[in-house]
């Protein structure tokens, strides 16, 4: 296909146009008075959402060059989402502000490479500042505050997540599922999460989120490599008759067997997913045995004279629900309390008997995984559309609270970044010079963008609010919900430091890439073929 090549200013301006479009669509959702965005779906009802990264994923423009700009800034949002799970809108607004200010300087003749160096140095300085000012999470009240803000000021959600963390611990697993009633409920059940995802992405049942969700599956547990599909055929036939899904947890699955499973999954013959067992050697076997206890199944191992081809349905484990993504697998089980607590006692005895610190640590990990359980939040809503929106908000809130536990909290509402602008300007003036200094000042000018946008979405002049906030002490900021200047930490308006840090780093990275772009190679727009003339009723024909 023919390509068009665009250079210099034209290339950057085309990128900027795409970035403007995406940033505006995402920015309307920012803050307590941010609006929703409606996404039209080819199939099914439209989706009403308030989540930056989901909106960014939906935007595709007709012009290929502008679409490249959209894809670049979408990357800032999705990388922030991967790292911290929240703060995607802030990252987009920051990246947009940095690109706008930077392009003005490049157009005026500044050297883009030196500007980028200045931007990177400013970003490193700010990351240090954010970590310096982060306060560790003290109690479940602080967790509830983080959850409330991330869920779009829904206090009930914040409280529920704090309760869930109290019950399963700060490292515990919180899982979301669609409830049957109008109310959102919390339930704690047995279960575990381990750090292995699906072997092939073709096992994903939800392609938008790239997740495989199996309801009431059978679970086949084995410590051997599955090389031939013939070994699996007897079990697969028994399961196909029941119509239930199957999860296979094995040491590995080789290409031929994997290909057969994938083909059966895609053709709809059998809903199946396969995961490699976590750990190595004896430790791997012990972890699979833990899973067997949890799911009330049996480990199919040749040490006990059991072979895959002779496996019966009653040897397989069962679970209420299994969720698998590319990195983790979460099993939600139920009804095996006695077996699980006996197994936990066994592990505790092993811990008492071992002298090795390393073994103790690994046993402690296994115990935590098995005893911790899983908190299941059943999302309740009146309609399908509300359910999807609520699920996205809850997911953001869970991710934000986990990030807050990891790296602490900072004042929210765009306050932290705005307060750091004067400090950055001062540091840059004494440590940088020339175009590097201009690069750092580009970042400084962009730091107030999230706060200004939050204020504008609340119907107030953003520039005035930003200047007022800068003149106050570090913890004081603008509460857009009621239009007052308050101490953000006391008012419970807080952001996880990790979210603020990731958003800033990804925004600076993308801005640097856009500014140093000198040429774009993109597909030529396809020429639309002229429609054929309609038959009958022609103009100049004699009949």
Curated annotation (Swiss-Prot):
Q: Would you tell me the protein name for this molecule?
A: Chaperonin GroEL 2
- Spell out the GO cellular component terms annotated for this protein, sorted alphabetically and separated by semicolons: cytoplasm
Instruction: Please name the Gene3D superfamilies in this protein's record.
Output: GroEL (3.50.7.10), GroEL-like equatorial domain (1.10.560.10), TCP-1-like chaperonin intermediate domain (3.30.260.10)
Lineage top rank: taxon = Bacteria
Q: Where's it found, cell-wise?
A: Cytoplasm
Protein purpose: Together with its co-chaperonin GroES, plays an essential role in assisting protein folding. The GroEL-GroES system forms a nano-cage that allows encapsulation of the non-native substrate proteins and provides a physical environment optimized to promote and accelerate protein folding.
Question: Which organism does this record belong to?
Answer: Synechococcus sp. (strain CC9311)
Q: Which residues bind ATP?
A: 29-32, 86-90, 413, 479-481, 495
Q: What is its main location?
A: cytoplasm
